[in-house]
Amino acid sequence: MRVAVIQQANSADLAANMDRSEALVRDAAAQGAELVMLQELHRSLYFCQTEDTDCFDLAETIPGPSTERLGQLARELDIVLVGSLFEKRATGLYHNTAVVLERDGSLAGIYRKMHIPDDPGFYEKFYFTPGDARFNSGASGFTPIQTSVGKLGLLVCWDQWYPEAARLMALAGADMLLYPTAIGWAPADDDAEKQRQLNAWITIQRAHGIANGLPVLVANRTGFEAAPPDGGDGIQFWGNSFISGPQGEFLAQADADSETVLLHDIDLQRSETVRRIWPYLRDRRIDAYEDLTCRFRD
């Protein structure tokens, strides 16, 4: 199955961002992609660099204008399309939500980001409520979304640092792990620190694929986005979107600075082959992991 991840640079022009996303999705579909994933919050600039109540105006309902447009695009191109939105769930209640549109344009499912960061330049707790542990008719927040191309273990950005999230998706039968992302460097970081951060980000996601015997798709944004005048120094998003296999092998990788339609033909049967020789799920000591639900083992 041919998959595509979209690496895009954004501007303050919401309409232009969506037009550009659509053009890149069309490019991917023209090259035979059946599953296409956009980056985190692809409709706008990364507004979480500062805490500003006016930014809540960017939020929209699901279903809403963006899911309608993405659904029409998925139906026209006969693809499964993964988008990422600032969701207004109710008055005063907002989420960072990934959406999956089926080939017929219907909404196959949503995933509300579970782990919410609050770091300099990434003030997401101001805007986003964490996803519910259980939603969508009682399903766990870490439940794959069933589609015509497989069961998608869809997570979002900061979730990618947590092995528990990937494991729970795998235990629920995910065929692949997907991470729409918005991450980059602070301009004040020196080159050595930047390289350490990038290497850690790539390594941990590939490790989730290895530990669970699954392919991994990662879509990050690229380009420099200045902070608002009362904010910080801006963020240089580091791109490097990639696709890796169930042994962590690189299948495709973008560079840091270019808008990219990254494609690869993945074989979902390889997970069966890999899990036979590396039977991690078989050898888990489920009787010994109770303390994983503790905040800390005091």
Question: Which residue ranges define each predicted feature?
Answer:
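Short beta-strand segments enriched in small/hydrophobic residues
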Residues: 1-8
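Active-site catalytic loop in hydrolytic enzyme cores
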Residues: 60, 72, 89-189, 193-203, ...
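A conserved C-terminal secondary-structure "cap"
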Residues: 271-298
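CN hydrolase (nitrilase-like) catalytic-core segments centered on the catalytic cysteine
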Residues: 59-82, 151, 157-260
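Active-site beta-strand/loop signature of hydrolases that rely on acidic residues for catalysis
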Residues: 3, 17, 25-54, 74, ...
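Short beta-strand scaffold segments in enzyme catalytic cores
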Residues: 83-85, 97-100, 143, 241-243, ...
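Short, active-site-adjacent cap segments at secondary-structure transitions
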Residues: 43-46, 89, 224
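Short beta->alpha transition motifs characteristic of CBS
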Residues: 51, 99, 110-117, 242, ...
